[in-house]
Amino acid sequence: GGTPPHANWPGGARVAVQFVLNYEEGGENAILHGDPASEMFLSEIIGAAPFEGARHMSMESIYEYGSRAGAWRLLDLFRDRDVPLTLFAVAMAMERHPAVIERALADGHEIASHGWRWINYHGMHEDEERAHLQRAIEIHSRICGERPLGWYTGRTSENTRRIVAEEGGFLYDADDYSDDLPFWSTQTDTPHLIVPYTLDTNDMRFATAQGFHTGDQFAAYLIDAFDTPVSYTHLTLPTIFRV
């Protein structure tokens, strides 16, 4: 609203920067995962249609890149610069490729849960979604040695936030895009912390309409998005910048 709270960031900082690595490859729709069709969402094959009842070999290969090469390149980059990351890690992907998680833990990164599967939960029965959440927690706890404290589904149902809050062990969820600061949800029976995420300063826009075509475009957009709350004299309140 017109009088947002003043976030007291350490050292009087104006902007809290959060870098997020979505580790999803291995949890997407695929015939080999028992799904009725191949993945169609967020790939270099723009507008890809799902293959019903058949494997999409190119799509499977595209999604395999993350665990084979992409994640390691990013982890090396953040290690070299000593910058912390939050991994939104899909539990099925964690289980298939635990070495990525082991490396992230060794580097001191936060591992938040991104659900059991990287699928659309809209319309899923509440009992099934709750079972997926419990399975994600079990896998995460086994691989990481402790349960997840952060949660992000991505493609939620109308029940997701309540299910997450009722589980009782999470410090926050990030299934929200509505604010520049964390806030307490009033949609649950008990106070539940929301740390908003972003689909704006997000490299998924390389695979969406009106997105980015070059690294220079993405870099310029990130710089503008960061500089705006810092340089405008009337924007004096601390904020979060998420990438």
Model-derived features with residue positions:
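Early transmembrane hairpin module of multi-pass membrane proteins
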Residues: 42, 66-71
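Short acidic-aromatic active-site loops that bind/stabilize oxyanions
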Residues: 60-68, 126, 215
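N-terminal regions that are enriched for targeting/export leaders
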Residues: 1-58, 62
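Active-site-adjacent pocket scaffolds in enzyme catalytic domains
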Residues: 1-11, 19, 135-142, 146-232
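Short, glycine/acidic-enriched loop or turn micro-motifs at the edges of active sites
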Residues: 25, 117, 178, 239
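Conserved small/polar residues in nucleotide/adenosyl-binding loops
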Residues: 233-239
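Metal-dependent polysaccharide deacetylase catalytic core of the NodB/CE4 family, i.e.
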Residues: 46-57, 72-75, 79-159, 188-190, ...
